[in-house]
C-alpha cells in the first residue's frame, strides 16, 4: 500500500521503499511548502502528479545525472552558441520561464505544472532556492529552464524552446556556470536520448543518494546564486538513517 503523508509532519519513507512499477513512486500526500520541497530534494525525491490527483512523490532508479564538467557540445550546437544571436541570463525572468514550460507543454501533451506547483516553485525562487536560466534573442524569451539548487546540486525541473536548440543553450550555460562556481551535479531525473547526447548518464539510485550526501552540503562560491539555500529542519529516512520520476515532462524532455 502506498504510504500517505500527513501534511503537518515533514518526513518521507526511505527511497528504497519506492515501487518498481510505476518506477519510483514512493508516497502520496504531504504538502508543497518550501520545507516539504527542500526535504524532498535533499533525499532524492520530487513531486509529480496530474491535475486532480493527490501530491505524488517519486524517486526513480536509475537516475539520470549530468556532471557539469562532462557537458558535451556537438559541433553544430557550438556553432549556434557562437552565431545564433542568443543572450543568456540567470534569474532574470523565473516566472516567465515556468509559465512558458507549463503553457508549451499544455499545448502539446498536457502539463504537470499546475497552478499549485507554479506557486510552490515561485515561493522557493523568492526564498533563493529555485533558479532559472533564460535564453533571449532580439529581446524575446525563446528558451530556458528552471530547477532547485541545494548546495552543489541543481535539480532540473523543466525546460522549453521556442526556437531550435534554445533549451540546449540554456543547459550548456548552466553546466558551465556550475562548473565555474563549485556546482557538482545536475539531476536530470530519467533517461532520454536528448539529454544523453549532451553528456548526461544514468547512475544507480544508491549512488545518487551518496552524491547528495556529499554535494548538498558542499561549499560553493557565493557568486553561484544570489541567495544561499534556506535551512529547513526536515526529517527524512535514507539508508544512512533518519535525517541523513518518473516525471513525464521534466528536464528529461524538451518542450518546443
Swiss-Prot record:
Q: What is its EC number?
A: 2.3.2.6
Is Transmembrane helix set as a keyword in this record? no
Q: Which GO terms describe its biological process?
A: protein catabolic process
Locate the region Disordered: 232-256
State the Gene3D superfamilies in the record: Leucyl/phenylalanyl-tRNA-protein transferase, C-terminal domain, Leucyl/phenylalanyl-tRNA-protein transferase, N-terminal domain
Keywords for the protein's UniProt record, in alphabetical order: Acyltransferase, Cytoplasm, Transferase
Instruction: Please state the protein's primary subcellular location.
Output: cytoplasm
Which is an annotated GO molecular function term of this record? leucyl-tRNA--protein transferase activity
Q: Name one GO cellular component term.
A: cytoplasm
- Where is this gene product found? Cytoplasm
**Keyword Cytoplasm attributed:** yes
The text of the family note is: Belongs to the L/F-transferase family.
Q: What does this protein do?
A: Functions in the N-end rule pathway of protein degradation where it conjugates Leu, Phe and, less efficiently, Met from aminoacyl-tRNAs to the N-termini of proteins containing an N-terminal arginine or lysine.
What's the protein name? Leucyl/phenylalanyl-tRNA--protein transferase
**What is the phylogenetic placement of the source species in the record?**
Bacteria, Pseudomonadati, Pseudomonadota, Gammaproteobacteria, Oceanospirillales
